Every structure is written in structure tokens, then in C-alpha cells.
Amino acid sequence: MIIKPRVRGFICVTTHPVGCEANVKEQIDYVTSHGPIANGPKKVLVIGASTGYGLAARISAAFGAGADTLGVFFERPGSETKPGTAGWYNSAAFERFATEKGLYARSINGDAFSDQVKQVTIDTIKQDLGKVDLVVYSLAAPRRTHPKTGETISSTLKPIGKTVTFRGIDTDKEVIRETVLEPATQEEIDGTVAVMGGEDWQMWIDALDEAGVLADGAKTTAFTYLGEQITHDIYWNGSIGEAKKDLDKKVLSIRDKLAAHGGDARVSVLKAVVTQASSAIPMMPLYLSLLFKVMKEAGTHEGCIEQVYGLFKDSLYGATPHLDDEGRLRADYKELDPQIQKKVVELWDQVTNENLYELTDFAGYKTDFLRLFGFEIAGVDYDADVNPDVKIPRIIDTTV
């Protein structure tokens, strides 16, 4: 079939398998052209491995450090008549390129929050890898079924303690719109912490440790975003921020556990990028469009792969990691450069419907958004007939 983009709200409901493959190849080429990661990991588990930062971590480990990788994700395959999810196509492409390079690459499809998927992962590590020396935790999910209670909990993006009004882009109509968010209830805050906080990360590490599949010296990292003042009301000081602060609490006990075997655990702070998760946050399209404009003009703009490859090379496996006072690894310092933030803040209230494309890089934002789904990739013929039914040969699918 011939597949064109169809966008509804913050989701593109179609995906392009050839475009997704080309996007993965571009990221692999970036890593291989920038040289190997010295003293990098050799056997890596990535939880949330199919898109965005998790995919970039899997690519950086495999093609930067020659690592064997096991990826966990929750995606949907295509059929002859309907495209699958972008993460399915990304993972199919990654596995093919990694296998061609002689690397082990295998994936587990299912709910990473579940005990079942944790057990299947442990069994697969024992059978195929023995032990892993890096665990990357990169889950972004709107809800979680708690494995112990069976309760399904939802996360909420709301401020805490006050109503917040802020500007944003209505990405469908391409107009500036004011949005009012009411404060989160305590139940909503608790739910967000349960879904997006550190409990599941800790459950993963506890399960892997008890099963004896963590190598001596193993490291783990979970990805987070802090942002600057302009996003704090609805992010760091809001319900999501409470979940992110929970990561900072949970990492301490995880670090103690791994340190007993010479290992380490860190929260890694990454910059704002276009992902399926960030595009759902009402103010982020405007913030990202301004940030892209300012950072591109300064020559410091980066996407997922640049961020994560840099994090691996400079901090996770670097001699002098970028650490903050809380012990987090920082890869977001270019975004938080005071000059960059000052310009973003200056432009924030100047943007109107008329000058949207002039004052911001909304065009670049839209391109990056479509690239998530395999569109707008150079060299791909979007008028060609493609088969949406792409197989991942050795996948362990717990959803069927």
C-alpha cells in the first residue's frame, strides 16, 4: 500500500516502515561516524527500547560500544492492510542492522510493568546473555496496571496547588491558544507517581538482582527531564514533577544495591526533544519550536541520538561525567544555557498566529514530529508501494 501521514491531535495514525528504517539507519550512521564509546557496555537491557531516547540508547550501545542488546517494548505489528506502530518498525530495522553487524539483538513485546514480562526478560537473559552490565529504563506511559494489586492507574499532567494558564500551539489549527489547567487532586498526583515514578524501575532492578542476571559492576540509568523556569509550573512543580522527584528518591536505594557489586545507578537528565510523549504536553510544541529556533541559530541543537550518544561517551562511560549536586548525570546543559533560555523567554509572549513561522521553528518541530512515524525522511520514496507487514524474526511476543 501507499502510506501517507494522517495526523490526529498529537498522534500520527499512520506510519511508514521504510521511513522508520531510514530513520534508524540515520541514527546508526551518526554513532558510527562519531567513533566508538571507550569502555562501553557489552550486554545491555533497554526497557522502553523502541522509540525516542530508549531507541537512541539501544543504537548507541550496539553501534557505539558493540554491545549485545535485549529490548523491551509494547508495540503493534502491521498487517497487509494496516500499518503497525513506528516502534515496531524501528525495532525490526534495528535488529536487522545489528544482526548484519554480527551483534545479538532480540526484543520482547509486552507490558514492561507486568511481572510476566520481567520474568520472560530474566529467562531470556539467562538463556542468551548470561548477565547484563547496563540496564536503561526509558518508559513513558499514560497508565500502568500495578503488578501486585491489579489496579490500573493513570498519570496526569497538571499543576499542583494552583490553576495555571499558559500559551501553546494548537498543532492541528496552527494557532496560538491559551490553555487553563486546574490543579491535580492528591489522588491524581499519587497516580502519576505510581505510573511515571521510580517504583517500576526499582522493581526491575530488584527482580534482575534476585535472579542473578546483573553482572558485577553493572550500571543502570533512568531518563528524565527537568527543564527551566518557563516549563516548571506544569512540569517540574506539577504532577509529572512529583514522579520525576520520586526517581531521585528511588535511585538512592538502587545505587546502594548495585554499589555492593561495584555498580552504579544514576538518573540522566536529557534535553527537550520531539517525542510522542512530549508532543502530548500542551505547552511543549511552542517551547520546542522556540528552543529549536534559538539552539539552531546558536549551533547547539541536538536530537535524541546526539543526546544519548553524548551521555554514554561523556558521562555514563566517561572519565569526567557531567554530574549535578543531586548526583544526576546531565546532558541538558546546552538547553539550559542562560543565553538560550533568555531568548526563549523573550520570544515567548511575542509569538502570534501571524508570526508563528517567523519567530519559531514550528516548521522544524512539525518535521521532527512526522519523522517519529517514518515520514519526512530524506531519500524515501513516499509514492512507492510498501508492505506494512514487517516481521521481527526472533521476537518474543507476550501479547499474543
Curated annotation (Swiss-Prot):
Transmembrane segments: none
Pfam families with a match to the protein in the record: Eno-Rase_FAD_bd (PF07055), Eno-Rase_NADH_b (PF12242), Enoyl_reductase (PF12241)
Gene Ontology molecular-function annotations: enoyl-[acyl-carrier-protein] reductase (NADH) activity; NAD binding; trans-2-enoyl-CoA reductase (NADH) activity
Active site: Y235
Any coiled-coil regions, as ranges: none
Disulfide bonds: none
Pathway: Lipid metabolism; fatty acid biosynthesis
Binding-site residues, substrate: Y225
Manganese found in the keyword field: no
Residue positions binding NAD(+): 48-53, 74-75, 111-112, 139-140, 244, 273-275
Known EC number: 1.3.1.9
Catalysed reactions, as listed in the record: a 2,3-saturated acyl-[ACP] + NAD(+) = a (2E)-enoyl-[ACP] + NADH + H(+)
Residue numbers marked as site, Plays an important role in discriminating NADH against NADPH: E75
Methyltransferase found in the keyword field: no
Keyword vocabulary terms for this entry: Fatty acid biosynthesis, Fatty acid metabolism, Lipid biosynthesis, Lipid metabolism, NAD, Oxidoreductase
GO-annotated biological processes: fatty acid biosynthetic process
Top-level taxonomic group: Bacteria
Similarity field: Belongs to the TER reductase family.
HAMAP family according to UniProt: FabV_reductase (MF_01838)
Subunit structure: Monomer.
PANTHER family per UniProt: ENOYL-[ACYL-CARRIER-PROTEIN] REDUCTASE [NADH] (PTHR37480:SF1)
Summary of the function given for this chain in its UniProt record: Involved in the final reduction of the elongation cycle of fatty acid synthesis (FAS II). Catalyzes the reduction of a carbon-carbon double bond in an enoyl moiety that is covalently linked to an acyl carrier protein (ACP).
Protein name: Enoyl-[acyl-carrier-protein] reductase [NADH]
Species of provenance: Burkholderia multivorans (strain ATCC 17616 / 249)
Gene name for this UniProt entry: fabV
